[in-house]
Amino acid sequence: MARQYFGTDGIRGRVNTSPMTAETALRLSIAAARTFAPEGGREVVIGRDTRRSGDMIEAALVAGFTSMGITPVLLGVVPTPAVALMARETGAALGVMVSASHNKFEDNGLKLFSPEGIKFDDDTEEALEMAMGTALKGEYAAPAEITLPRTMAGTSNRYVRRCLDTLAGGQDFSKLKVVLDCAHGAGFETGPAALTELGAQLTVIGAAPDGININAGFGSTATGALKAAVLETGAHIGIALDGDADRLIVIDETGTEADGDQVMGLIAGEMHRTGRLKGGGMVATVMSNMGLSEYLKTEGLTLARTKVGDRYVGEHMRAHGFNLGGEQSGHIILSDVSTTGDGLLAGLQILSVLAARGGKASDMLRVFTPAPQELINIRYSGANPLESDRVKTALAEAEGLLGDRGRMVVRKSGTEPLIRVMAEALDEDLMLKALHHAANAVTAAAGNS
């Protein structure tokens, strides 16, 4: 079925524009209450990031849940993985995170978690889509059964402690110089708290949220400020979170960026070496570099691929017994501890390896030599360019150029009006030829030529 609300990662869009309106949040909360707690009397945990519209969306959720006899438990500003944690540890019927992740403040979104702290699968989202359409026409709780929201203090401390407890005792982090970029987002308190407790020599940037500066010039998709701070302070390593702190990008001491593929490769190798890796390998998406796959082969490990979205990675991990997975964009799932991507948790594992091994982050994070890979994002309005016959022909031609010497992934973003065109091959000239052949066709169909 065609979806009106849900995309790759929950519901997301420009605030006060469909689908990201207060009415959508109201419909969702009522539909979710009827679907997951039809008898009422349950609790739902709700967290949010720092963007200005978060209070508005939260208020709409509260109105819907209380009208159905469900008690909203307000966690305040917390990372997305903290909401997943509290959903599974409090017996809640549902967890809701109000966030648009790495997007600017003009956008917001809703991420949903089951009582097990797991993002909903496609079938569940489609059931909610159906229920949201008629949400305002059904019955509500009797007046005496309408609930009141309550706040829950201590979620941030509980989450930080859970992350820190994953580290081996007795490690000395006091010699590590670390710069942490919190993106003016949900991790602006939890990230510094965790690294301060470690005893690292810490410099914090991007930790002064004002409601509109989330992800603006800071964070995992804007690493210029972090690179400059690492070089200026002589830090050994820099870590950038995104707006809801469920992913990270790492910067080495030279100011060079290491993406999620390199981070996953490092963690996989370390977990394999210490006998903690399950499933004989790890899980990533179709966007991960083929160099990661080749590296894992040399270690006797496998790489399973899914479509884009950390929830699909998580689904495959649970179904096939893996405990490590993630995305090139920096969502890393360590399922022995967390059920979803977690930037702080992954960052702590990297710092632990660096503290144990010594040496330079630049050496440690160069786990494999990436195959030449390039991604072009093409914005569009109106019809989906991928429906064009000319685009379909051009994509087939580009894939024919690559043959078995490379890969091409072309997809519509589930969170923004973008077509993403990615190509990779060991032969860079071949990769670029195929990439631009495909991208030019998409650009023309999008009306950008």
UniProtKB/Swiss-Prot annotation:
Whether Magnesium counts among this entry's keywords is yes
Q: Which Gene3D superfamilies match?
A: Alpha-D-Glucose-1,6-Bisphosphate, subunit A, domain 3 (3.40.120.10), Alpha-D-phosphohexomutase, C-terminal domain (3.30.310.50)
Q: Where does Mg(2+) bind?
A: 101, 242, 244, 246
Its Gene Ontology cellular component terms are: cytosol
Gene Ontology BP annotations: carbohydrate metabolic process; peptidoglycan biosynthetic process; UDP-N-acetylglucosamine biosynthetic process
Cofactor notes: Binds 1 Mg(2+) ion per subunit.
- Disulfide bond positions: none
Question: Which molecular-function annotation in GO is an example for this chain?
Answer: phosphomannomutase activity
- Might you give the EC number(s) for this enzyme? 5.4.2.10
Modified positions (Phosphoserine) in chain numbering:
101
- Annotated active site residues, numbered on this chain, are 101
Top-level lineage group: Bacteria
What cofactor does this protein call for? Mg(2+)
Q: Which top class of enzyme applies to this chain?
A: isomerase
**Which key words tag this protein in UniProt?**
Isomerase, Magnesium, Metal-binding, Phosphoprotein
Reaction equations catalysed = alpha-D-glucosamine 1-phosphate = D-glucosamine 6-phosphate
Q: Which family does it belong to?
A: Belongs to the phosphohexose mutase family.
Question: Which PANTHER family does this one have?
Answer: PHOSPHOGLUCOMUTASE (ALPHA-D-GLUCOSE-1,6-BISPHOSPHATE-DEPENDENT), PHOSPHOHEXOSE MUTASE
This molecule's function is given as:
Catalyzes the conversion of glucosamine-6-phosphate to glucosamine-1-phosphate.
Q: What is this protein called?
A: Phosphoglucosamine mutase
Where does this protein come from, organism-wise?
A: Hyphomonas neptunium (strain ATCC 15444)
